[in-house]
Curated annotation (Swiss-Prot):
Biased composition (Gly residues): 1-10
Bias (Basic and acidic residues) ranges: 732-749, 864-880, 999-1009, 1079-1094, 1119-1148, 1266-1281, 1294-1306, 1377-1387, 1453-1468, 1508-1519, 1531-1548, 1629-1644
Organism: Rattus norvegicus
Major subcellular site: other
GO-annotated cellular components: axon; cell body; clathrin-coated vesicle; extrinsic component of synaptic vesicle membrane; neuron projection terminus; nucleoplasm; nucleus; synaptic vesicle
Location in or out of the cell: Cell projection, Axon; Presynapse; Cytoplasmic vesicle, Clathrin-coated vesicle
Name of the protein described by the UniProt record: BTB/POZ domain-containing protein 8
Subunit structure: Interacts (via N-terminus) with adapter protein complex AP-2 subunits alpha (AP2A1) and beta (AP2B1).
Name of the coding gene: Btbd8
Length: 1749
């Protein structure tokens, strides 16, 4: 960098260096150099002069005319060597500070001379000679002296020159502090040159500075004068001040040399090897401001070429200079560099070195570039940025530049749009038009125009229009061919102006527009008229109501606004009172009529409200409007169903099976399709509570409508949007209703191919379906997806059930409806609000209340099937209204249905959520119900909380029944309650008027049959009706409630009202639901076993009523007794259900075990009964667990589960507030529940256990509605418990939506039980027998759940009527390997299709399973081999495989919960262990996930290894295993810990057990595992590893495990619920399911089988994935869909290899499903499979996989 020429000899070099410098430097920056030189020389002169004035470090004293002058020998030597030689010749040179006289010179004259010497930038030779002459004249011997003087001067000069050469020698000798480069540096002035000579000569140096081992000899005086750093260091008391040699750190010798040259000579150049940036730092550190200026100058000169037009070689150096300036803080240089870069940003940004610029500087470049935008350069910068984007290669180092260019382009477009009128006139815009005209695509112009369209506002529209007009008139636009583009934008602007005329005319720019334009716009705007109203009228027309699909779509937006209208619409058939509740879409036509008739007030608005509600979920659900909407919806739904009965084309096959079925199915499908997409877990979460609360009202109507299954579809249509809100609940309800309906129509059920048969297998199956739908509703979005699959079967089942009989038909119809319209629950909710609004409707509803429980169940179901939440809700809503209609026609039937309401825990859970709302809402319209509810709530807040999900719906429904029914007779309600309780399913068939009577009769018959057959629905309804006396029957009732979605939902809602007023469903929707479920179960158990019931009830109450202590049990009982009066059956149902739950689960988990508890209690009081329950009650148990499963996922249960802290599940102290609040469970689901519950029987612990998903949550149940929604969106599992008598007891859905019904109960209880079991021995101390029974029940329940899910799926399968839920995974899990083999084999041959749970549903299932294990236990116990076989057969019918999988999933969940509860109850919980190990084969995935956890627990449970216990253990182990992942791993302790499910035990135990339970386990487990895996997958895609581990290595083997793992890996885990983590298999399955369901949603509507198959396939996938421990790279949706499709096809082709004798059947069924992984590559999105082999029904509906993410 030395620009001085190469200096020759040092002596010559120095003098010539200035010339050399001038010669080398005169460049383009000469002016800057001159300025810098002047500054530096002046500074040097000033510094040296300061030495003289301050007399720093002087070493010589001159006496002049009596005056003393202190000077520096070195300076005098450098500046005036002759004078120095003259005065020192007379003295000894060695002395310092010697007084030297100067004669013949005046002091003033000498002083002036010294100043010149020290400061002059010019040579002082003349002054020196002058002073010497004066001195010599005064000398005595002037000549001689003169000669000597000159001699001395010459000598001195020579010496100086000679000394100057010495440094050369020294330099050559190794002192490298002086180099030739340094010698070449040019001094700034003569003073600098003289001082530099002094430095180089090293004369009179008095200090050595060591840097990098090199010594620099210097003079203290000059260093101090030039540097503040040295001045401070060399003066004062510093050690360096007295040292001869000092060492400097942090500086290199090159930098030191540059610094010394500048100090002495003020050099303006640096050596080439110097680091300018580092020198800048040195200058700052040593206080050399001049050196800093020189460094900046060098940077500008050498790096930036003084910022003249950059050339390629300078671009990189300018960037380097920019970085240096930024690091050192040279703002001026930084600004100069930045300005240069801004001017040529495209060149600089494309430099590779730009990638090395710090990101903050890059951002500054971008921001400054954006700031530089102006009217003139905006278009230019837009083009430049586009060139940059198109020209840069797509490599790593260009990422930053590309990103910046894209941002800049966007800013340019924004700027141009904002200033379009000015930019348009600029030359750069003309260039832009030219370049775009020459471009193949005028993309930049298109971007500008699109941005203009997007940014049109009232303020800028006028100015934009004027600018476009100007542009259109310009020649350039016409020449370049952009007239069309510009005109298109102008037309849009014109349209906007016309539409927004009233807003635009007030803007300033409007005044600037041309008058002609103003007049034209005004004329066009004023001629609008009432077009919009006209547009709405068709939507409100009755004719449009029949357009279910289109209406759903149309009304959806309105539905949000007109939820009430939507809800009322489904009830059209009953009356137009529900009209106000505008149908979502299916019931829109009927709803319109009804709305127009009954609630003319804003039909459209109501419809909009419903739609909004569906969309917003919680928004509209929590309100009286919803309550009103529900009854209306039911009525409209009924009417619409009837009107649509001929119209429904949703499932022609199923329609063929049963007109009603078709109606419900068609509507459900349409609604599903229309609304399922809209239904979201979040929406559901919020609305589910509302629905749950509103559901009681709706339930009441549902009861009324329970008679006609057709009502479900109508309700769906009417409540399309509501359906979305309550879709989870509704879908589940519908499904549950469908199941119950199937049961009710046990003889009729076969009318519907799959669903009917599924439901037919028994009320248990129906219950399972119902509970499961609840779980599904809870699933939320995933549930929706899964329920799309499930919905088909559900709807079919519903239709079949309708055909089957009033009782079963209704229930089936409800499931179908729920399945089809994810908004069944919403419909119910809508109907309920409407009921509130329209007391007459309530009266009708009261008549229909028997059906209303079904509706609630349906709601629960829809909540359960969040995947089909919208559709299911729609279906349920429609069903509810239809039920209402039927109810109007058949008050008796409705009353009968009222019983089923309490009967269905799932429904109750779901309805409970809605019931909470409805209770609140209903309380306003009618105090009768409220009073009964009030008594219930206060008495058993905790129980209410537990039951809140399940029973709350019942209570509220009951309340609604009371309120709505008072006009009718309470006797009727009681009768309804009794009848429905006996056969909650009849409620669903009731929606049809004809079937209504039949249904009623059937319900009564079911009631009889229920007691006789022990059918879940009948038995449960009857048991509940019968009274607490049938404690185990009530347990089944609870299941029945869940199972009989519509009826049970309503009953469940009413049940809390009647059975558990203290339980206060309304208050603690989530917690209370769980608690209510528990207390109900406990009651059932108590009634079953007298001595068990009291404690159980207490536990239930305590669990359900954190605020209500154990004493509350009395209240609960009294409340139940009170309820008995008007709702004897309901009361029994609720009580029995609740006590059952509480009794068994008390120690386990009052709330979580609600379903399980029901089962457990049932099982405990009579193991025989539970054995039966295992077969018949397996569904129920599953249903109950499913209801619990739903709990975590359902809104309410979700709340409970999400905040599944111990208190959360059992119930919250705020139970009463829950009554009031739509989602008070959100408020109190946590601590209060846990505290009281745990006190009583560890119920509060149950609460924690219940929230395996929420193990980490605070006891105050901190899960937010969002979390609840997530859960709700998750898989909804219906747990069905079979009564000992064979009745299926829909325990609970494990969905939040079902929470009001008791859904949280099973989940909460079972899950809560586990944590509480850990925490409290009481739960664990529940009798082993009971626990074993419960375990069996739980396992059976799991199977039932799956069967139930399968039921939903197999609604289309006629053969799957009753067996389905019983058969489920539960059968496999709880029956002996051989026993289950034969049964499962038939089931396998039937190829039961589990409902394909959506991811959310799967998550919910996982969550529910985690919590529902306890419920599964009862199911296991009650499930007898025959029951299990029956369930299996039922599942075989069409849903068998899938249902089983689902059930088993639920069972696993329930089992998991139960196992947890059992951990406390070690005997029972661990009874599952042996079977669990067996079951792993069957439910290996579930077991593997849960079993790994659970296998650890099983040792405890194995204390009582009963065969059925084993079944239960197996099943529970599956469920538990799944749950164990998050819940049961450590038994109770883990139950309370969220990480539980993370502790997946390796499936070694599973592997050992697989062979025995393989057939059965695989069947049930795959069904269960699939949902659970799906659940886990949906919820915890992150846990894939766990999923792999959890997935059984043996069962569905590696393929399934792999699939599971793949799904699991693909799906991100939902941190929200530990259950997701817990149920790895479920997560995987859920993930698969989610993908499948999303893809399958549309097809699911039409194909329940497809849904079931999907679920089964997903399970297989999950299991295969887990077994393979391979993370498949299946795309979450498409690949899974393809995989599942292929697997389905493969299954259709051949039953696959059995894994063992026990696995043979299971494997036949499952191997059919296990090949999807193999054929996953096949990219068929839609697969048409018709195979009698695969399908027990011999019917494979088209498996349409609509891969939606």
């Amino acid at each position: 960098m030395a620009h001085c020429g190469a200096g020759g000899a040092a002596p010559a070099g120095l003098p010539r260096s200035p010339g050399l410098g001038r010669k080398g430097l005169p460049r383009k920056g000469s002016g800057e150099r001159r300025r810098l030189k002047a500054v530096v020389s002046e500074q040097l002169s000033r510094d040296v002069l300061r030495l003289l004035r301050e007399e720093m470090h002087t070493d010589m004293v001159l006496s002049v005319s009596g005056s003393l002058f202190k000077v520096h020998r070195a300076v005098l030597l450098a500046r005036a060597p002759g004078f120095h030689s003259h005065i020192t010749g007379h003295t000894s040179r060695g002395l310092t500070d010697e007084l030297i006289p100067v004669d013949s010179v005046e002091a003033s004259e000498f002083k002036a001379f010294l100043q010149i010497v020290y400061s002059s930038n010019k040579s002082v030779k003349n002054y020196e000679e002058e002073i010497l002459q004066k001195m010599q004249v005064g000398n005595v011997m002037p000549e001689k002296g003169l000669d000597v003087s000159f001699l001395q001067c010459r000598t001195s000069s020579d010496c100086f020159l000679g000394k100057h050469e010495i440094p050369a020698d020294v330099t050559s000798g190794g002192d490298s502090f002086i180099s030739k480069d340094d010698c070449d540096l040019e001094p700034v002035s003569e003073l600098g040159a003289d001082l530099l000579k002094l430095y180089l000569s090293q004369d009179y140096h008095d200090i050595d500075i060591c840097v990098d081992g090199k010594s620099f000899k210097a003079h203290r005086a000059i260093l101090s004068a030039r540097s503040s750093y040295f001045a401070a260091m060399l003066s004062g008391c510093w050690a360096e001040s007295s040292q001869e040699c000092i060492t400097l750190q942090g500086i290199t010798h090159v930098e030191m040399s540059v610094m010394m040259h500048f100090i002495y000579g003020g050099t303006l150049d640096f050596p080439e090897k110097a680091n300018v940036g580092q020198i800048l730092n040195v200058a700052d550190m040593y206080g050399l401001e001049g050196l800093r200026e020189v460094a900046i100058y060098v940077l500008r000169r050498d790096y930036c070429n003084f910022f003249q037009k950059p050339v390629p070689r300078t671009w990189a150096s300018i960037l380097e200079c920019l970085v240096i300036a930024h690091s050192v803080g040279v703002e001026s240089l930084f600004a100069d560099c930045m300005n240069c870069i801004i001017s040529h940003f495209a060149r600089f940004w494309s430099e590779r070195s730009f990638a090395n610029v710090p990101p903050e500087i890059q951002k500054t470049c971008l921001s400054m570039q954006i700031q530089s935008l102006n009217h003139g350069n905006a278009a230019l910068l837009l083009m430049e940025s586009d060139k940059l984007i198109t020209g840069l290669p797509r490599v790593k180092w260009t990422e930053a530049a590309l990103s910046m260019a894209s941002q800049l382009q966007g800013e340019c477009v924004t700027f141009i749009v904002q200033n379009f009128s000015q930019v348009m006139e600029s030359a750069s815009f003309t260039l832009l038009l030219q370049s775009q005209a020459m471009s193949s695509t005028a993309h930049l112009l298109d971007k500008i125009f699109k941005a203009i369209e997007d940014s049109i506002t009232a303020e800028n529209s006028c100015s934009l229009l004027m600018a476009l007009d100007t542009l259109l008139k310009s020649d350039s636009a016409e020449e370049m061919g952009f007239t069309c583009r510009i005109q298109a934008v102008r037309d849009k602007l014109w349209t906007f102006l016309v539409q927004s005329f009233y807003a635009v005319r007030h803007t300033e720019s409007w005044k600037l527009m041309h008058i002609d334009d103003q007049q034209k716009i005004q004329a066009a705007a004023l001629d609008k008229g009432d077009d919009r109203r006209l547009g709405r009228k068709p939507v409100l027309s009755s004719s449009q109501q029949r357009r279910q699909g289109s209406d759903v779509i149309k009304i959806k937006p309105w539905t949000g606004n007109n939820k009430k209208l939507c809800r009322a619409s489904p009830s059209t058939n009953e009356k137009m009172r529900s009209d106000g509740l505008g149908a979502s879409g299916h019931a829109s036509g009927t709803h319109r009529n009804s709305v127009n008739k009954v609630s003319k007030h804003g039909e459209g608005t109501k419809v909009s409200k419903v739609t909004t509600e569906v969309k917003t979920g919680a928004t509209h659900v929590p309100g009286k409007p919803k309550t009103t909407i529900k009854p209306q919806t039911e009525n409209n739904a009924h009417t619409k169903l009837e009107s649509i009965s001929s119209t429904v084309v949703g499932r022609p096959a199923r329609m063929a099976a049963t007109g009603r079925k078709d109606l419900a199915h068609g509507k459900g499908i349409q609604n599903q399709e229309g609304e399922t997409t809209g239904a979201r877990p979040k929406v559901l979460t919020a609305n589910l509570n509302t629905q749950a609360r509103a559901k009681p009202l709706q339930t009441v109507k549902g009861k009324d409508n329970g008679c006609s299954a057709t009502v479900g579809p109508s309700s769906r249509s009417a409540n399309s949007s509501m359906e979305r809100l309550a879709s989870t609940g509704s879908v589940d309800e519908t499904k549950e209703n469908g199941s119950v309906e199937d049961k009710s129509c046990d003889k009729k059920p076969y009318v519907s191919a799959s669903p009917g048969q599924m439901v037919y297998n028994g009320v248990t199956s129906t219950v399972a379906v119902k509970s499961r739908p609840v779980s599904r509703v809870t699933s939320g979005t995933s549930s929706k997806k899964s329920f799309i699959h499930e919905q088909g079967p559900s709807v079919t089942s519903s239709v079949i059930k309708k055909g089957r009989g009033s009782s079963k038909g209704l229930n089936d119809s409800a499931p179908q409806t729920a399945a089809k319209r994810g908004g069944s629950s919403n419909g119910y909710a809508a109907a309920q609000p409407r009921t509130k609004s329209a007391p007459p409707t309530l009266a009708q509803t009261q008549g229909s209340q028997g059906e209303s429980p079904h509706s609630v169940k349906s709601s629960i179901s829809s909540r359960q099937s969040d995947e089909s939440v919208t559709r299911l809700r729609h279906g349920t809503d429609k069903q509810m209204p239809k039920r209402k209609v039927v109810k109007q026609g058949h008050a008796t039937l409705q009353k009968v249905n009222a019983k089923p309401t309490p009967k269905n825990p799932s429904q109750s859970t779901k309805g409970g959520t809605m019931t909470s709302k409805d209770s609140k809402q209903k309380v306003l319209p009618g105090q009768v119900t409220l009073q009964s509810q009030a008594s219930q709530r206060p008495s058993n807040p905790e129980a209410a909380t537990t039951q809140r999900s399940v029973l709350h719906g019942v209570n509220d429904n009951r309340s609604q029944v009371f309120k709505q029914r008072p006009p009718e007779s309470l006797v009727n309600l009681a009768s309804d309650t009794n009848g429905p309780e006996a056969s909650p399913s009849p409620c669903r068939p009731q929606p049809q008027s004809p079937l209504g009577n039949q249904e009623k009769t059937r319900q009564e018959r079911e009631h009889q049959d229920g007691s006789t057959l022990g059918d879940s629905v009948k038995h449960e309804l009857r048991s509940e009706l019968t009274s607490i006396e049938q404690s185990h029957t009530p347990a089944y009732k609870v299941s029945s409630q869940c199972s009989a979605n519509p009826n049970c939902g309503c009953i469940a809602s009413l049940k809390p009202v009647t059975s558990n007023p203290s339980e206060n469903w309304i208050n603690s929707n989530t917690a209370n639901t769980d608690q209510v479920c528990v207390s109900d179960r406990e009651r059932q158990t108590g009634r079953k076993g007298t001595d068990r019931e009291p404690s159980v009830n207490c536990v239930a109450r305590k669990a359900a009523l954190p605020s209500v202590p154990a004493g509350m049990s009395g209240t609960l009982k009294s409340a139940q007794d009170d309820r008995k009066l008007p709702f004897h059956r309901e009361e029994l149902s609720a009580q029995g259900h609740l006590p059952h739950d509480c009794a068994t689960e008390d120690s386990k988990c009052a709330t979580p075990t609600s379903a399980v508890s029901s089962r457990c209690l049932l099982g405990q009081p009579s193991e025989k009964g539970y054995k039966n329950m295992e077969a018949s009650g397996t569904s129920e148990s599953h249903e109950a667990p499913e209801a619990p499963f739903m709990g975590p996922w359902d809104l309410n249960t979700s709340a409970t589960h999400q905040r599944e802290s111990p208190e959360s599940d059992t119930g919250s102290a705020t139970t009463s507030s829950d009554d009031i609040k739509p989602r008070s469970e959100d408020y109190d689901a946590g601590g209060s529940q846990d505290d009281e519950g745990s006190h009583d029987r560890g119920v509060s612990k149950c609460s924690t256990a219940l929230c395996h998903d929420f193990l980490g949550r605070s006891s105050s149940d901190t899960s937010t509605p969002e979390e609840l929604k997530v859960h709700e969106g998750d898989l909804r599992t219906e747990v069905r418990v079979r009564k000992p008598g064979g009745g299926d007891l829909p325990l609970h859905s494990a969905s939040d939506d079902e929470t009001p019904r008791k859904k949280p109960d099973p989940w909460s209880r079972s899950t809560i039980v586990h944590p509480r079991e850990k925490g409290s021995a009481p739960r664990g101390s529940v009798p082993s027998a009971q626990e074993v029974d419960q375990v069996s029940s739980s396992a059976d329940e799991t199977e039932d759940e799956r069967s139930e899910a399968e039921n939903v799926r197999e609604h289309s399968s006629p053969s799957n009527s009753g067996t389905q839920h019983v058969q489920g995974i539960i059968n496999l899990a709880f029956e002996d390997g051989t026993e289950h083999e034969s049964r499962e084999f038939s089931a396998t041959k039937k190829f039961r299709r589990s409902v394909l749970l959506s991811v959310d549903e799967c998550e919910e299932v996982g969550s529910d399973e985690g919590e529902g294990h306890t419920p599964l236990q009862p199911s296991l116990d009650s499930l007898s081999p025959s029951d299990v076989f029956d369930g299996v057969s039922y599942e075989h019918h069409g849903r068998t495989g899938y249902s089983r999988f689902f059930k088993e999933n639920e069972a696993t969940t329930a089992e998991h919960k139960y196992s947890r509860g059992n951990d406390g109850h070690k005997n029972e919980g661990f009874l599952l262990s042996p079977r669990s190990r067996d079951f792993p084969r069957q439910g290996k995935q579930c077991v593997s996930t849960g079993e790994k956890t659970r296998l650890d627990v099983p040792p405890k449970a194995s204390q009582q290894p009963f065969p059925e216990s084993k079944d239960m253990t197996s099943k529970r182990e599956v469920a538990h295993g799944l749950q164990q992942h998050g819940t049961l791993t450590d038994g109770d302790t883990r139950s309370q810990e969220r990480p539980c499910h993370l502790e997946l035990h390796q499936r070694e135990p599973s592997s050992t057990i697989p062979k025995i339970s393989s057939a059965r386990s695989l069947d049930s487990c795959p069904s269960q595992v699939l949902p659970q895996d799906g659940q886990v997958t949906a919820t915890h895609p992150t846990p894939p590893k766990r999923a792999n581990n959890a997935v059984f290595s043996g069962d569905i083997d590696d393929c399934d495990t792999m699939a599971q793992t793949t799904m699991y890996d693909h799906r991100p885990s939902k941190t929200l619920s530990p259950i997701h983590e817990m149920s790895l298999t479920a997560a995987c399955e859920q993930k698969e399911e989610s993908g499948t369901h999303v893809a399958d949603r549309a097809s699911e509507d039409e194909q329940p089988f497809a849904k079931q198959d999907w679920t089964l396939l997903k399970q297989l996938l999950s299991e295969q994935d887990a077994n393979l421990n391979v993370t498949s790279s299946l795309p979450e949706d498409l690949s899974l869909a393809q995989y599942l499709i292929n697997q389905t096809l493969l299954l259709a082709r051949d039953s696959s290899k059995p894994q063992g004798s026990a696995h043979a059947d299971t494997w036949n069924r499952w191997s059919e499903l296990s090949s999807p992984l193999d054929d996953l590559t096949a990219s068929a999105t839609t697969v048409s499979v018709s195979s009698t082999d695969c399908s027990p029904q011999g019917e494979w509906t088209i498996l349409e996989l609509e891969t939606q993410h």
